[in-house]
From Swiss-Prot:
Source organism: Caenorhabditis briggsae
Protein name, UniProt field: Guanine nucleotide-binding protein alpha-1 subunit
Binding-site positions, Mg(2+): S47, T182
Region (G5 motif): 327-332
Function: Guanine nucleotide-binding proteins (G proteins) are involved as modulators or transducers in various transmembrane signaling systems.
Region of interest (G3 motif), residue spans: 197-206
Residues covered by region (G4 motif): 266-273
Lipid attachment locations (N-myristoyl glycine): G2
Length: 357
């Protein structure tokens, strides 16, 4: 399973080196170039925001490029099932359908041996379908906040038949749901109203963060992506640290960094759809992450307002303007609306007083 991920990561590394070289050569951008830095903790959705910029402001993904994502879709689907099985075992939940024990063995062997599927063979397709239909797996999925599981798991499980079609080509929505950790720096470049925007996405995992700061001291604005729905989840890296608390600490480091004192900050509170589901349907209290929260337990707006205040409080300079937007990064229309508002604000120089121009 690691082969397709390795190819994707190798390409990221190649592009990252190229970008770093360009940054070293041209430290200061031309006045017609606006450099934006896209930051956020791992799995916040920042790479999805970057993909949306390609879709909205560039030509999106070519058919050839989309075809190369088939491996990633298949890998993400099998990896998600492996994580779901692992979570089920941690919770001591058993399969209802006994055949799923054999399917579990296939999943584990596939993950350990890095077997690649494109598309799934009959055995893997049957295994994934039977497992997703099993009541034990569904019970574990209902408790997914207790273990690590990618947000895209259900999306891909519900699309198994389509993904397994011989002529399957990943759609833009499929690509938006794929997940390969960002290693190094990835860039999207586009033009808007006579300006060239260069947007840089940098690795969000702990091991990646120290690599980017010095390269972007001339960024015009920071877009920090924070996942609202991670308040009841732990980090993939250590499986103990609360994800939202980690994101807050990273935001604190960024917003107070000496390189970004005069840089405007735009905060995307992302995954609002998943957040609403947890607050309203699953009734997962915000007090899981914040003992101090005393607002209504099933009031999404009250909870978001509280989280908003927590992020703003991270800035040592209380006069620093932080522009906040609620987003669902997989919703192209919603992201387009937010991005247009953000970019128009930048172009109209409304952020001039905060050092944008």
């Amino acid at each position: 399973m690691g082969n397709c991920d390795s190819r994707e990561l190798a390409e990221q590394t190649k592009q990252s080196k190229k970008i770093n070289t360009e940054l070293a050569i041209a430290k200061k951008d031309d006045e017609n170039v606006i450099k934006l830095l896209l930051l956020g903790a791992g799995e916040s959705g920042k790479s999805t925001v970057l993909k949306q910029m390609r879709i909205i402001h560039n030509s999106g993904f070519s058919q050839e490029e989309s075809m190369t994502k088939r491996n990633v879709v298949c890998a993400n689907t099998i990896q998600a099932m492996g994580a779901l099985i692992e979570g089920m075992r941690q919770l001591r939940i058993d399969f209802v359908n006994r055949i799923c024990n054999a399917h579990e063995k296939l999943i584990r062997e596939t993950l350990s041996e890095n077997t690649e599927y494109n598309p799934f063979n009959d055995a893997m397709y049957t295994a994934l379908s039977d497992l997703w239909a099993d009541k034990g797996i569904q019970s574990a999925y209902g408790k997914r906040e207790l273990f690590y599981l990618a947000d895209s798991a259900k999306y891909f499980f519900d699309s198994l038949a389509r993904i397994n079609e011989p002529n399957y080509i990943p759609t833009e929505n499929d690509i938006l749901h794929t997940r390969v950790p960002t290693m190094g720096v990835i860039e999207v470049k586009f033009q808007m109203k006579g300006k060239v925007f260069r947007v840089f996405d940098v690795g969000g995992q702990r091991s990646q963060r120290k690599k980017w700061i010095h390269c972007f001291d001339d960024a015009k604005a920071l877009i920090y992506v924070a996942s609202l729905s991670e308040y009841d989840q732990v980090l993939l890296e250590d499986n103990t640290t609360n994800r939202m608390q980690e994101s807050l600490q990273l935001f604190k480091q960024v917003v107070n960094n000496k390189y970004f004192v005069n840089t405007s900050v735009i905060l995307f509170l992302n995954k609002v759809d998943l957040f609403e589901e947890k607050i309203i349907i699953k009734k997962r209290s915000l007090t899981i992450a914040f003992d101090a929260y005393t607002g209504p337990q099933e009031d999404v707006e009250a909870a978001i307002t509280f989280i908003d205040s927590k992020y703003r409080a991270m800035a040592d300079n209380k006069d620093k303007n932080i522009y906040v937007h609620k987003t669902c990064a997989t919703d192209t229309h919603q992201v387009q609306y937010v991005l247009d508002a953000v970019l128009d604000t930048i172009l109209s120089s409304k952020l001039k007083g905060c050092g944008l121009f």
